[in-house]
């Protein structure tokens, strides 16, 4: 049965005598559904005439060579109205089993003579304990009607099957007319036939639809709804027709949809008195077939009232609102449906709502909802959507797709006993993910929570900030998300149970016959919530905590800076930080010597250097080395003899006088030698590279400068030799630091004058050298 074109958003209304039923023709809507034949013209033979008159077969329902009768097909989705008083309560199990059942009515203008030899119509009436379930009560028909006789009926299987597993048994409408005939011989009037699409008892489920839904793709598989047709003149045209049906716990308020009439009635047929003879064709499901999830998006939001059964365990999945800012990682929801968090101004689920969901799951509060929620309540609470427990209704998949794309709050109901579907209402797997098929068994019956997407992304941003120590990179994004999502209270955090990543993977496994959601669920523990960094008062970004390695470095720098401030005044050579310390000499000792902090020690060292240098000026290097060696030996031998004589006189045994020095370890290890060699290699290599660059004139200006320096050194060498220059350097090292500390102001003034004079001379020289001026600029 093909879907009719788009339907108007209007309630059911009875037709007037001169118009089609329910206002289809009255408003000028004329259309021919797919698979139906065009309107019958005058003079054409009526459908059903002959031996096979009135036989509703699968060929006749779809398409075939036989002409279709002027039949109006109508499908209505209604809320729960009060069951008529005349309806026997013993027939209510059929209605209870088919909560939200879909009624499709075929209204024909042709009446047929009764045929005694025609086969009975199966599934006309549901017989339950000797009572009859009719589609309409006498009050609904507007005229008192007698009780209908029992009609034998069986559950047909395999005669006619559709794609959704719905079966129909063809039968003759004349038998229906004969059985349901009015005692006043009104069989010549127009008969109203019904096709009742209901579920078997094992397919019970909670069907929840929202008010104001305009279904653009009407199909017999799209909705679980009820249809009731009324005779003309019973109600006002603008009043919604009362519908038959009864729900046990939930009152659903749905919007009716209409199929336009196929045929245009003639004036003669309009003048005929119409009496509806209700006939019900029961279509049963052969089993819930496995149906793959579809990615259809319903533009309208559905507001559903979720009332779980006592044997269900809710799994509430909370997600943060989406961020449409350019800097946000999370893309906005696809489609035209706004998320519930966006409709509330980026709200989030509070503690009261979580507790309310727990109470509803335990069956502590069950309320009958006969109308949509007020605007105030809808604004205070996030809109909760539910999916039907039966996998044969594709409209639930539309709700899933729209909700999964929008990132709304999700409430999942997982049944603890999915096999007990015959004793109680089926506890289907209600979720908003792309999940369908049999409900998965929960890991445990306790309540399980997982915080999705935005909350986890905010945590990842904070962790990245801590690792990179760059608080400014996330100052615009992380605080905004933290303000949008208020922190949960400790009581709620205690109730939240940690959900592992394997659990999130199971819910989206291919065994559920559903595609994986675009955004995976990441587990989130209360410990992570408590460890969230607080935003600073400056730029609003979380204050990063420096790692331990970075905390140790400032301590080492503080130790090195606690030494003398004069250490920074003497710049070390290139790569001085790579120079390993000497065994008996380090940087601190050198500073102490140069600043005369230990006068005795500094005097001895300074005198020794002066003696050595002056000796070299008078004698050769070989003579100086020999004399120094003889002087050292004479001193040590004399001291050794003196100590030996003293011990002999005093009759003491103190041992060797240089025993402490002899036991002192002065050997260099292989590692120390390697360090000194590497340091020396660094200096040698850098010197060789610089000399090669200067002598090979890589830069003409630098080579000319080096040439001028060498020319000046020729005059210095004529006046001083190397030892004299070395002696002057040693004297300057031990005298200039002390003089500069004592007369720093005067020294700085004179140094400024000298620097200015030198710059003037250099400028004059560069002006005379070709190419030097361009290089300076």
From Swiss-Prot:
All copies of domain Reticulon, residue ranges: 590-777
Pfam families: Reticulon
Compositional bias annotation for Basic and acidic residues: 199-233, 495-510
Gene Ontology biological-process annotations: brain development; endoplasmic reticulum tubular network formation; negative regulation of amyloid-beta formation; neuron differentiation
GO cellular component, one term: neuronal cell body
Main location: endoplasmic reticulum
InterPro entries per UniProt: Reticulon (IPR003388), RTN1-4 (IPR046964)
PTM sites of type Phosphoserine: 13, 68, 210, 241, 325, 348, 350, 485
Record's function text: Inhibits amyloid precursor protein processing, probably by blocking BACE1 activity.
Name of the molecule in the record: Reticulon-1
Record gene name: Rtn1
């Amino acid at each position: 049965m093909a879907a009719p074109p788009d339907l108007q958003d209007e309630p059911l209304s009875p037709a007037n005598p001169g118009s089609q039923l329910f206002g289809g023709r009255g408003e000028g809507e004329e259309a021919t559904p797919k698979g139906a034949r065009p309107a019958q013209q005058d003079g054409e033979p009526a459908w059903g005439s002959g031996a096979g008159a009135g036989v509703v077969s699968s060929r006749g329902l779809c398409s075939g060579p036989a002409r279709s009768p002027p039949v109006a097909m109508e499908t209505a989705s209604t809320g729960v109205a009060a069951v008529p008083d005349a309806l026997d309560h013993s027939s209510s199990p059929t209605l209870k089993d088919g909560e939200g059942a879909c009624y499709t009515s075929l209204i024909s203008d042709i009446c047929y003579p009764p045929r005694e030899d025609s086969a009975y119509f199966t599934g006309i009436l549901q017989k339950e304990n000797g009572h009859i379930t009719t589609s309409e009560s006498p009050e609904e028909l507007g005229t008192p009607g007698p009780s209908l006789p029992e009609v034998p009926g069986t559950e047909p299987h395999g005669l006619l099957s559709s794609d959704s597993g719905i079966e129909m048994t063809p039968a003759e409408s004349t038998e229906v007319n004969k059985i349901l005939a009015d005692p006043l011989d009104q069989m010549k009037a127009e008969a109203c036939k019904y096709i009742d699409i209901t579920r078997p008892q094992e397919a019970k489920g909670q069907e929840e639809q929202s008010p104001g839904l305009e279904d653009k793709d009407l199909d017999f598989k799209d909705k679980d709804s009820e249809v009731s047709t009324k005779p003309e003149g019973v109600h006002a045209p603008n009043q919604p027709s009362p519908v038959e049906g009864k729900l046990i716990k939930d009152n659903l308020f749905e919007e009716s949809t209409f199929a336009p009439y196929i045929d245009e009635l003639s004036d003669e047929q309009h003048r005929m008195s119409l009496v509806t003879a209700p006939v019900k064709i029961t279509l049963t499901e052969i089993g819930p077939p496995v149906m793959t999830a579809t990615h259809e998006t319903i533009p309208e939001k559905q507001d559903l009232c979720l009332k779980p059964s006592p044997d269900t365990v809710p799994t509430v999945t909370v997600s943060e609102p989406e961020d449409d800012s350019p800097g946000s990682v999370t893309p906005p929801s696809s489609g035209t449906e706004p998320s519930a968090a966006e409709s509330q101004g980026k709200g989030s689920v509070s503690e009261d709502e979580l507790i309310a969901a727990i109470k509803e799951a335990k069956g502590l509060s069950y309320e009958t909802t006969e109308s949509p929620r007020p605007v105030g309540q809808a604004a205070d609470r996030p809109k909760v959507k539910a999916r039907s427990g039966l996998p044969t209704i594709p409209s639930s998949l539309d709700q899933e797709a729209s909700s999964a794309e929008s990132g709304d709050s999700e409430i999942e109901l997982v049944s603890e006993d999915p096999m007990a579907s015959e004793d109680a209402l089926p506890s289907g797997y209600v979720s908003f993910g792309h999940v369908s098929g049999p409900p998965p068994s929960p890991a445990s019956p306790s309540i399980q929570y997982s915080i999705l997407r935005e909350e986890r992304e905010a945590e990842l941003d904070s962790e990245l900030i801590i690792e990179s120590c760059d608080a400014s990179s996330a100052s615009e994004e992380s605080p905004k998300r933290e303000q949008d999502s208020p922190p949960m209270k400790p009581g709620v955090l205690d109730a939240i149970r940690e959900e592992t990543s394997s659990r999130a993977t199971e819910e989206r496994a291919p065994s559920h016959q559903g595609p994986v959601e675009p955004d995976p669920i990441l587990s989130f523990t209360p410990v992570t919530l408590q460890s969230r960094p607080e935003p600073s008062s400056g730029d609003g970004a979380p204050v990063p905590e420096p790692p331990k390695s970075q905390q140790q470095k400032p301590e080492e720098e503080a130790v090195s800076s606690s030494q003398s401030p004069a250490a920074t005044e003497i710049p070390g050579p290139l790569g001085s930080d790579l120079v390993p310390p000497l065994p008996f000499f380090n940087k601190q000792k050198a500073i102490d010597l140069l600043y005369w902090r230990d006068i005795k020690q500094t005097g001895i060292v300074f005198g020794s250097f002066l003696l050595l240098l002056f000796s070299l000026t008078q004698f050769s290097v070989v003579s100086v080395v020999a004399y120094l060696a003889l002087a050292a030996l004479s001193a040590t031998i004399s001291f050794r003899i003196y100590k030996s004589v003293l011990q002999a006189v005093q009759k003491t045994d103190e041992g060797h006088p240089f025993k402490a020095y002899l036991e002192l370890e002065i050997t260099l290890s292989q590692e120390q030698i390697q360090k000194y060699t590497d340091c020396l290699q660094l200096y040698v290599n850098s010197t060789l590279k610089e000399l090669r660059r200067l002598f090979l004139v890589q830069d003409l200006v630098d080579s000319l400068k080096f040439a001028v320096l060498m020319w000046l050194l020729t005059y210095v060498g004529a006046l001083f030799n190397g030892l004299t220059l070395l002696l002057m350097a040693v004297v300057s090292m031990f005298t200039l630091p002390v003089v500069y500390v004592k007369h720093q102001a005067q020294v700085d003034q004179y140094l400024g004058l000298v620097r200015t004079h030198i710059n003037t001379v250099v400028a004059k020289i560069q002006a005379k050298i070709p190419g030097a001026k361009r290089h300076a600029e």
